[in-house]
Structures are given as C-alpha cells and as structure tokens.
Swiss-Prot record:
Protein name from the UniProt record: GDSL esterase/lipase At1g29670
Organism encoding this protein: Arabidopsis thaliana (Mouse-ear cress)
Record-linked InterPro entries: GDSL, GDSL_esterase/lipase, SGNH_hydro_sf, SGNH_plant_lipase-like
EC code: 3.1.1.-
Compartment(s): Secreted
Top-level EC class: hydrolase
Keywords linked to the UniProt accession: Hydrolase, Lipid degradation, Lipid metabolism, Secreted, Signal
Main localization category: secreted
Record GO terms (molecular function): hydrolase activity, acting on ester bonds
A GO cellular component entry from the record: apoplast
Amino acid sequence: MESYLTKWCVVLVLLCFGFSVVKAQAQAQVPCFFVFGDSLVDNGNNNGLISIARSNYFPYGIDFGGPTGRFSNGKTTVDVIAELLGFNGYIPAYNTVSGRQILSGVNYASAAAGIREETGRQLGQRISFSGQVRNYQTTVSQVVQLLGDETRAADYLKRCIYSVGLGSNDYLNNYFMPTFYSSSRQFTPEQYANDLISRYSTQLNALYNYGARKFALSGIGAVGCSPNALAGSPDGRTCVDRINSANQIFNNKLRSLVDQLNNNHPDAKFIYINAYGIFQDMITNPARFGFRVTNAGCCGIGRNAGQITCLPGQRPCRDRNAYVFWDAFHPTEAANVIIARRSYNAQSASDAYPMDISRLAQL
C-alpha cells in the first residue's frame, strides 16, 4: 500500500511540474526573445572578458540583489520587456546559457560593442554586432538539434522577437574619440551614418537568413545629454548638440531602413523604437515621470558625477528613483522601466514605428 501511494505521489508531482511549465510558457506572448546590443542591455557577457567595460562589482546591481554585469542599479530595458512579454524570468546571457534554456531566448549584448568592428577597442575585449550574430548562428544550430530538424526550428524562431540596439558606442567610443580613431577625419556625420546603416543592414539580413522575422530596432538615445557629455558642457545642463545631431542623423536613417527592410522582406516585420524621443521626454519633463535629477549620475566622480563612471565600492545616491542616470552613461532602473514600457506599449505616435512591441508580438 505504501509503495502504491508513493508511486501516485510521484505521478502527481510530475503532473504538477508539467502543468507549471506549460503555464509559464503559455503566459509568454512569444516563445523566445533574443537580444543584441551594448552596455545598455548587457547582462553579463563581458564578465569573463579582459575589458574595462565591465560592471560585475558593487554598487552595480544594488537594487537587483547584487552585481550581475548589468550597467545599472537594477533592471535593464530588455529585462522589463521580457516581463511585459510574459516570460517567467530574465533572458540569460550567452556566456552562461545552456541546454534547453536557449529555447526561451539568449542575450548576446556586449558592453563597448559597436556596429563597426574597431569600435570600443581602447576598452579591451568586446563582442561586436557581427560577433553577436555569429554567436546567434551557433545558437540556431543548437535549436535545430533540440527541436529535431530545420523546419521545426524555422517555425519556432520566426515567432520570436529580436531586439537590436547598437550605435551609441560607434559615436562615443569611435567617432567622437579622435585620439584613438580616425573615423571623424574620414567621414562627415552624414557619411558616417550611411556607413553604419550599411553595416547594420548586412547583419540584420544575416539574422533574417537564420530565421529571425520579428525585429525591434532601437535608435540611439540622447547621448549628448548624458552626465559624461554634460560634464564638458559650459553650464553642465545644456546637452551637447554636435553629439545629439549626429545621433539623430543615424536614427533618421535607421527609421528609413525599417521601411526598406519591410519592403524587401514581406514575410518579416521590422519596427523602430524611438529611444531618443522617449529619453528627451524624460529629460524635458522630469516631474511627470517622478525624476528630480536629469543632469548627473547617481554614481560617479567629477562634474555632473559623469567624468569618471561608478567605481567599485563607491556609495551611490540614496534616492535612485529620482535620477534618470545611474552612472556617467547608463539609465537607472526607473528610467529603463519607462523606456521599456513605452517601447512595448507606445504612449505617443512617435514612440514606435510602424507599431510597438506588443503589436509585434501578436503577429
């Protein structure tokens, strides 16, 4: 009798476990979420690299249970988007993911990474956009093995969302760093943006060729309004126009690329997320979003707490929700939540084009 009851208990446990897995999967609006980007969304891929661009130390992650490699006090935008999409947990970093975990998605983002190969080299090792795409191609081979054949894998991957956001470092750690790079002497801002978009398009088409069909492309934020940029501004409050103007040239071309890619690939859907506009709204109307400090980092050194970014063991500000910026370059969790929510569910017509992520997920 005891053996009989034991067997039934085991069966019930297995049934409950199976039901919980199905329920967790059913809650997600898409089967998987793949992330490509830089330090704005890196969640640990740089931890094992020989690089200055790392954040696996306190006080990074102070509101996340400890440092993980995220460049914020807490969640990044893609963490919040994963929650909004219904995933039961955050998308794992490529350098830690294993087995069937990849079926929920992978984060390939790398701090200091750019669209151009040389971008960020002065900071050490990083995984460029093309390197991230190669890592994704390895993942696809693993998905094929897990699902049994290429047809099943293709059907699975076409329903996933692919978040791509690069370009900031191609300006911060390339074009506007003439001591290390010659790009600003080789190209006008218009020419440089054309070069970046051409390279960007090549990698997006490579992702398409490996099964990606739902793309959310994030534009560059208001980099000229970061504490690091403002530290060099005469009054410490006026955004640096030459940086923002160059970024907007890129953003306008990226939005046009969305139209081009949608025309070239009718079986796919590409959308543009206006990170610049959302960021400008927070900076221009801080009280509306609960912010009090828009021109300084919560953790950093020097003017605007932005000349040197957050150092190991440094004590950050107390009221982190009152700050737009966590350090010299990166948003706080509070700002990331706003950006993510407006990317997922646009609050104005300019937030996303031609649709937001919630509608993209429904396709």
